[in-house]
Amino acid sequence: MNPVDDSAAAGREHDDPAFTTLIEQHRRELHVHCYRMLGSFDDAEDAVQDAFFRAWRYRETRREGAPLRPWLYQIATNACLDVIARDKRRTSLTAAAEAGDDVARSVDEVTWLQPYPDSLLEPTAPRESEPDAMVVTKETIELAFLTVIQLLTPQQRAALILRDVLGWSAKETADVLDVSVAAVNGALQRGRATLRRHLPSRKPEWPVGVDATAAERELLRKLVQASEEPNAALFESVIREDAVFRMPPEPGVTVGRDAMIRLWIEGGFTTSMRLRCVLTRANRQPALACYNLGKDGETYEAMALDVIGIDQGMIAEIITFPPTVFERFGLPASLRNEP
């Protein structure tokens, strides 16, 4: 890791507004870090606010001249660990992880999962003048990864994120977690093993030689068409046979294309809904914002956000979130029914 060297600004930190300005520069990347730790956009917001309060309160305790960024990461990580410790949903999963009980751990128990707008990830991308700015790659933010790391113990999760995602050294990670290097290496080894068990071998989204941009555009066009017509047969043509469907915060998972389509038909998809879909992106994945025509026939009301997972040119996963997430995506609550 090449920590951002904030020591040059140390002399200004006696001026409280200057200290606030300094830590605010790290808000975006700390929010992404807390989101990875917690899997929830809302909980990440709270954790960052808590971390900034702690940083402000204990700003005099930071060693003079020490880099600010690692210190803030330590505070933010501890804030996340406190959130996990207070949440019975999370502690039940982490207790099973501590016991090595894979049977008791399942992705459908991660009911607090929330999507992250791509538009809010862009400010952390590096610029030539900021070589240490965060790069948020798909592999480190996609929902499949975020879900599985919620099954890790808190220490395993933190070690994996700091070491494998952020690229920190074992010593730097040990300093953040206030444990030995041996403890970090052990937690990382166990965390990696869990990821290998729960995440299948990563395959390309598209076959070799396929224009991925054009192929994704065509796949999404068919998905939108199938949703708006509606057309169950067209749905069937774009969804993989072993695809999965989840609806956080509801528990449970629907496995298999036939089961998914049957569930949607039983829910009135082909009879009582008239949808309009807007393309967006979440977690570096394509997403559809779905609106359903209201009883007045004049307005489409926000219904759900579908985040799409693609594997080898087919839809392998759909995770549906409630319309409460629309605002953070900059999506309107309703659309006019216009020709």
Regions flagged by a language model, labelled:
Residues 175-176, 181-276:
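Solvent-exposed, charged amphipathic helical/linker segments at domain boundaries
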Residues 14, 112-156, 213-217, 221, ...:
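Amphipathic alpha-helical segment used for protein-protein interaction
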Residues 154-155, 162-183:
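Helix-turn-helix DNA-binding module
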Residues 260-339:
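Low-complexity, glycine/alanine/valine/leucine- and proline-rich hydrophobic stretches
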Residues 83-115, 198-207:
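Short, basic/polar amphipathic helix motif occurring as a linker/hinge flanking DNA-binding modules
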Residues 12, 40-41, 52-68, 82-91, ...:
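Sigma70-family region 2
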Residues 2, 9-32, 42-45, 56:
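A short, charge-rich alpha-helical start-of-domain segment used by transcription regulators
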Residues 46-53, 66-78:
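Structural recognition of an alpha-helix C-terminal capping motif at a helix-to-coil junction
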